[in-house]
Amino acid sequence: MNPNDNNLFGDIEQDNNPSFYGNQSFLRDPYGKSKQTCPPSVTSNGDPSITNDDNNSAHNNDLVSNSIVLSKKIEQMVNDPNLQINVISSERMINSSVVAYSIELSSFDDNRMIVKRRYSEFKSLRDNLQILFPTLVIPPIPEKHTLFTYLINSIDNSKELNIIETRKRCFANFLKDIIFDSNVALKSCVLVHKFLDPNYELCWNNAVNEPPVSLIPNNLLLANPVNPTDQNGLYSLLPIVNGFELNSNIDNISSLHKLNEDLHKLNEQVHVFELRKEQNERRHPSEPTTSLFTEIPISLIDFEKNFHQNIKVLTELNKLNSRSVKNFKSIINTLIELGGNLNNFSLQIHELNTDSNALSSLIEKFGSTIDSNFLGYEAFLMNDIIPEWQEPISQLVQYYLTSLQLIKFYKFKIIQYKLVYKLKFNKYQELANISTNFESQSKLKDLRNLDIDSPSINEAIKKIELNQKRLKNRKISSKKSWYGLFGGNSKPTFNLREDLPASTIPSEGTGIRRERTPLVSDENMSYPVNPSANLENTNIDINSHYKHKINQIEKELTKLDQLIDLTNTDISTLTQELNLNFNDFLVRVEKKWLVIMLEFIKNGKQLFKDNLQNWNECKVFINDL
């Protein structure tokens, strides 16, 4: 095989494209009504062997080549430091209330590209980026309209136009942040390139149903927290914690500080468990193969507190901004009314005294100065306060809310980490109960085989039967009660299918990810008080029965040990990634905040400078009269 064949499809990313497989004219004529059947034509060189099929094949090859070239062009433009990204226009789709936004990508070397996207496609891109990169703070987009907002917009069209203009600015900032002011992994993501690809303009759903998105399980808790596309089959065996929703801002879990205390208790339980296990198995203490994750770093705990405090402060600042915008609008309306009245008054004075126009000119100049100030205030409000101050502050709030979503994901992974240990504790206790029951059953069988009417033997038999009953009741009463604390409504027992061959059990690299393996019902793992009677009736050998159950649980414990090693490694890696990314995020936010403040001060200074110049001109005019 040619070694170059390994990269045969490496550059092809335009699959599932209508334009990739054929001419886009079929979109205008999808049912082929304008087609006319005609016999194969002979080419101009007179060779009848070259038909239209050959020409179509050559044409399709050209389309493939063009798509690959376009994909490469997008990749180059994204990495171009001189790239300009703007949302230049918006338009309503035909017979629909949906608005499409035109995104223009341009650079100094005359490269220019336009692609149209709807709000739902922007949201889809961001949601999928959050799933692909669960440790990165993804730039925010405007929130979706509520039903009440839609009703208001249907009454007042000007409000809807303002919202569309706001979205245009926010979408442009969203794309600029991804390309220029975020982790390099975001702008290198294939999904971002497809979003900017005109070939995917009409088939965005295909893009989100292709790799890498299609490789991620439905529940992000069943994936590698740092690399969700990892196809390690062990992740499909992890316990699910109900209530997890990455995109929601609702977080009902305790703070990281409280979870840290729970982790300390868990580590104490693990230590006691290992000691008892060593005593029961009569072996020397051994070093764990994987270092245990023992504590949440204080830096992450401080990050959570910091984010909450900043959200509180910025939310209050948003309220002040809203009041300031209303006050500016009130000032503008007052200046408009005052300027108009002064101009009318100057005309009335001029009509009353046509011989001298000094007073009329003075009043007119004063009104003109008021009008100039009104225009300055209006420009400051529409061009500076709203787009350069109010909207960026709201964007910072959304940034911090997104960072809290990452912390929420981290909390759920901590809980999942604890649940894996709880599963091991319960499963080991189940093994101990079955082993004890097996030993008791063997003793009971031996005692009954003695066939001696002895009070001491009868007392021993009763004692063994009582112990068996107590073991069963304890097993039933304590059965997986921890799972109910997290909203579980199904059996959480970690069971491997007894009829599943060992070769098919998910392990590293198997890629069994999409569906969880059906679990054996807990009833299959329960045992009667007097199992010998049932076993004799069904002619099942009691020894093989118990040995089979014990062997099954030992296999499950082996898998649980693998899961513990996996989760230990994942939690440690996730902690390091979040620490690193949050530090980088705060540096970026600090830069954004400085830029916002400096721009606000500069624009405000320019407003007052222009107002002062207007009044100085008015003063000079008055002195010259």
Swiss-Prot record:
Residues 15-26, 34-59 have a biased composition (Polar residues). Residues 79-202 form the PX domain. It is found in: Endosome membrane; Preautophagosomal structure membrane. GO terms for cellular component: cytosol; endosome membrane; phagophore assembly site membrane. One of its GO terms (biological process) is autophagy. GO terms for molecular function: phosphatidylinositol binding. Residues 1-59 are annotated as: Disordered. The keyword Hydrolase does not apply. Signal peptide: none annotated. It is a peripheral membrane protein. It comes from the Eukaryota. Its main location: membrane. InterPro entries: PX_dom (IPR001683), PX_dom_sf (IPR036871), PX_Snx41/Atg20 (IPR044106), Sorting_Nexin_Autophagy (IPR051079). PROSITE patterns: PX (PS50195). CDD domains: PX_SNX41_42. PANTHER family: SORTING NEXIN-41. The PX domain binds phosphatidylinositol 3-phosphate which is necessary for peripheral membrane localization to the perivacuolar punctate structures. Belongs to the sorting nexin family. Required for cytoplasm to vacuole transport (Cvt), pexophagy and mitophagy. Also involved in endoplasmic reticulum-specific autophagic process and is essential for the survival of cells subjected to severe ER stress. Functions in protein retrieval from the endocytic pathway. This is Autophagy-related protein 20. It comes from Debaryomyces hansenii (strain ATCC 36239 / CBS 767 / BCRC 21394 / JCM 1990 / NBRC 0083 / IGC 2968) (Yeast). The gene is ATG20.
